[in-house]
Amino acid sequence: MKKFLIITLVLCIGFAAFAQQGEIGNPDATRIGIETAQQMIREVSVDKFEHEGFWRSRMSSDNGYTTTRLFLGAPANKSVIAEEEGMDIPDIYVLGTRIDFLRRGHHSFTIYPVRPIPIEGITKTISVWVAGRNFNHELFVLIEDFYGRYYEFSMGKLNFIGWQRMTVAIPPAPEDGISGVIQGSRHHHGNFGITIVGLRVNVDPMEARGSYYIYFDDLRAETDLFTEHHRDADDMADGW
């Protein structure tokens, strides 16, 4: 009987751990950082990678060189954002980056916009479609918070075939309003949000050879726009 109880307990713990792992790549935006009784969660487009030259790439010239350009194409399983239904919004390109390695090592390369991209509201998740060519490299999203502080979050390994939507949750800020990723100020209702400053790939040194290709499409965010939609229109703007 005692042995049976121990086995049951181990299985329950294992199931709980598995359930937590399953949320890493598909977090529920409605359950992340609930700080108010009301939320207005919306999926918004951050960038569709439709403008040549807006995204660039770089890596140390000692380790290799990069080339970035647009290609016609799209993930077959990509869905349209509900608010964009019926709108004539261009969405025919994907962003491709080629890396030519000069030597093996613990390298990384960055894909970044020519100017940072702000996200309105309190961001819950960030997602992007990626074709990673089944390498053990790791993708990170790079952001700045309300105070301009830099953070990076792993979106996962690129060891899959074809297109996959990769998602990461942005951790809610602690109650002190100082530490962690701060997305706004409790003293006023303007300028809430974080800013996307780039994507970085950390290279597996065992696969840092020859040429490597990676493609991106449809950078999105799930964000709470309740404060943005309910602030007073006659409120004064600070910062003068």
Regions found by a protein language model. Give the residues of each.
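Sec/Tat signal peptide C-region and signal peptidase I cleavage site
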Residues: F15-A19
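Beta-rich carbohydrate-recognition modules and glycan-binding surfaces
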Residues: Q20-W240
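Single-residue recognition of alpha-helix boundary sites
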Residues: I13-G14, E228
